[in-house]
């Protein structure tokens, strides 16, 4: 008889995993396999069950039924500590760091002494191309850098299974490239990677195998090369929505309330005029935004975009310069007064500064209106508002009083957008609006943002997704090391040019529009 070589068992095999919450089935007999040295991408709409499945594998949640095996050995009663010992590490979509501890302390937290090797940590950081200051507090980092710290925690634990939940959501293309390079090094060492993402080009670039989840089950699974982009999108789309056109824009235009569209329609004055503004992380910033205009703000992480946005909203003090909103100087105003004047900010970190996680959905969606109008409890009105946004953005939830923290990350982001829109913005500053949002929902959000602009609301659009910036913005300001490196519009506004300018190159390629600064030579002039 010919000698038969036994096939080694998969690194990870999940069979028949099911899970319910309060009688609602969220996972339906899931089978999932990960081989050594493989990237297995996991796709699915918000609420499809991806995060729940990964939390079960990582020992955070127990399954109701099913078996988890590593290298052919069953794993019973998994806890996060046991999962770490087995080499399973989940890098969450929302960084979960100790804000008051240093970066180094966060990376080494609870590591056994034999693994807490500072030389190894330095080498891993070098391999990733990271230039993090290990002595600063983790809470002072941008979200993208916090994400890299989370990944470092997994790498320091010699993880054999690395679960990455939307790891590139807040990373620039250069940072994404470095991360992928490090992942490929890990693959050569036999590490298996579960890669959760909504970015189909990244999945094609990195993943060997792809599984698509829909409504708690596996709708499609196989080699990535065997499926077209359309195959994946169709597999993600619920049957009830196939062939249906989004009505987000129509619903938004039907929303009641004074959107100030009439008062701005005939005005030629900018909604906001920022002159020579300086503050923590940026200097000598000047620009204006007209009613109905979407102004993109691009740059690499650390360029000062979020610091600028927070200063405009009054969360940080300005050291010099002026901010004029509808001909009123608001530079010294408190945040509450800026909100009352119509300046609304959708923050980058929804869990830390955007939503009240333990409060009901219906209360959250009207929270800024509460702050502005003192309407602390109008249940019927709140329910009606939430229902409109549920239909417009396809927000998935069970009941009105459900706490926000029970929603998936993408649905939390949609709720935050709804909350900001309901505050009746005159100027809306949007920081990473599609972070953690699936492919099918992005188009809804884009249409919604455009429909707001059509109602003469001025929009400052901040995103690390440069293709998204080009798609959405009428003009783009590119920041580099806290200053405006140039302004782009028209045909000059493309990903390649923005990328070069974001890394400090000076390109005079803007098409002037109504006094807009046209080159890097005009730093400090009105853009």
UniProtKB/Swiss-Prot annotation:
It catalyses: ATP + H2O + (2R,4S)-2-methyl-2,3,3,4-tetrahydroxytetrahydrofuran-[AI-2-binding protein]Side 1 = ADP + phosphate + (2R,4S)-2-methyl-2,3,3,4-tetrahydroxytetrahydrofuranSide 2 + [AI-2-binding protein]Side 1. Keywords: ATP-binding, Cell inner membrane, Cell membrane, Membrane, Nucleotide-binding, Repeat, Translocase, Transport. ATP binds at residues 44-51. Residues 508-527 are annotated as: Disordered. Its EC number is 7.6.2.13. Residues 12-240, 266-506 form the ABC transporter domain. It is found in: Cell inner membrane. It is a peripheral membrane protein. Pfam families: ABC_tran. PROSITE patterns: ABC_TRANSPORTER_1, ABC_TRANSPORTER_2. GO terms for molecular function: ATP binding; ATP hydrolysis activity. Belongs to the ABC transporter superfamily. AI-2 autoinducer porter (TC 3.A.1.2.8) family. Part of the ABC transporter complex LsrABCD involved in autoinducer 2 (AI-2) import. Responsible for energy coupling to the transport system. The complex is composed of two ATP-binding proteins (LsrA), two transmembrane proteins (LsrC and LsrD) and a solute-binding protein (LsrB). This is Autoinducer 2 import ATP-binding protein LsrA.
């Amino acid at each position: 008889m010919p000698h038969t070589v036994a096939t080694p068992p998969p690194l990870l095999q999940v069979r028949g995993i099911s899970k319910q919450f309060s009688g609602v089935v969220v996972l339906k007999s899931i089978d999932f396999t990960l081989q050594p040295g493989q990237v297995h991408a996991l796709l699915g709409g918000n609420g499809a069950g991806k995060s729940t499945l990964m939390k079960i594998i990582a020992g955070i949640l127990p399954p109701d039924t099913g078996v988890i095996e590593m290298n052919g050995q069953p794993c019973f009663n998994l806890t996060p500590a046991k999962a770490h010992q087995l080499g399973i590490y989940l890098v969450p979509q929302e960084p979960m760091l100790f804000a008051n501890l240093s970066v180094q302390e966060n990376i080494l937290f609870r590591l056994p002494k034999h693994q807490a090797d500072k030389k190894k940590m330095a080498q891993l950081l070098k391999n990733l191309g990271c230039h993090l200051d290990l002595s600063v507090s983790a809470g002072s980092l941008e979200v993208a850098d916090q994400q890299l710290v989370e990944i470092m925690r997994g790498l320091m634990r010699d993880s054999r299974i690395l679960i990455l939940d939307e790891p590139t959501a807040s990373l620039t293309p250069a940072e994404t490239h470095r991360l992928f390079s490090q992942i490929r090094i890990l693959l050569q060492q036999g590490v298996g990677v579960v890669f959760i993402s909504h970015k189909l080009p990244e999945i094609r670039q990195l993943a060997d195998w792809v599984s698509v989840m829909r409504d708690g089950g596996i709708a499609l699974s196989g080699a990535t090369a065997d499926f077209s982009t359309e195959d994946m999108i169709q597999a993600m789309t619920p049957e009830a929505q196939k062939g249906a056109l989004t009505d987000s824009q129509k619903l938004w235009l039907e929303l009641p309330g004074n959107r100030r569209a009439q008062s701005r329609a005939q005005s030629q004055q900018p909604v906001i005029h920022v002159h020579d503004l300086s503050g923590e992380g940026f200097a000598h910033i000047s620009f204006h935004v007209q009613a109905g205009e979407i102004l993109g703000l691009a740059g690499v992480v650390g360029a000062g975009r979020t610091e600028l946005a927070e200063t405009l909203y009054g969360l940080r003090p300005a050291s010099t310069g002026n901010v004029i909103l509808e001909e009123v100087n608001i530079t010294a105003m408190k945040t509450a007064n800026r909100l009352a004047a119509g300046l609304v900010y959708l923050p980058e970190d929804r869990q830390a500064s955007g939503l009240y996680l333990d409060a009901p959905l219906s209360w959250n969606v009207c929270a800024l209106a509460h702050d502005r109008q003192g309407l602390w409890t109008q249940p019927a009105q709140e329910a009606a508002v939430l229902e409109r946004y549920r239909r417009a953005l396809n927000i998935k939830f069970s009941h009105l009083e459900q706490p926000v923290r029970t929603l998936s990350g993408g649905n939390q982001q949609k709720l935050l957008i709804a909350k900001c829109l309901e505050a009746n913005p005159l100027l809306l500053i949007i920081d990473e609006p599609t972070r953690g949002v699936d492919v099918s929902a992005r188009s809804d959000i884009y249409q919604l943002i455009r429909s707001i602009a059509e109602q003469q609301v001025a929009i400052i659009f901040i995103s690390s997704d440069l293709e998204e910036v080009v798609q959405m913005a009428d003009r783009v300001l590119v920041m580099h090391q806290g200053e405006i490196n140039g302004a782009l519009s028209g045909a000059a506004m493309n990903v390649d040019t923005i990328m070069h300018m974001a890394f400090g190159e000076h390109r005079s390629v803007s098409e002037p529009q109504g006094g807009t600064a046209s080159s890097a030579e005009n730093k400090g002039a009105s853009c």
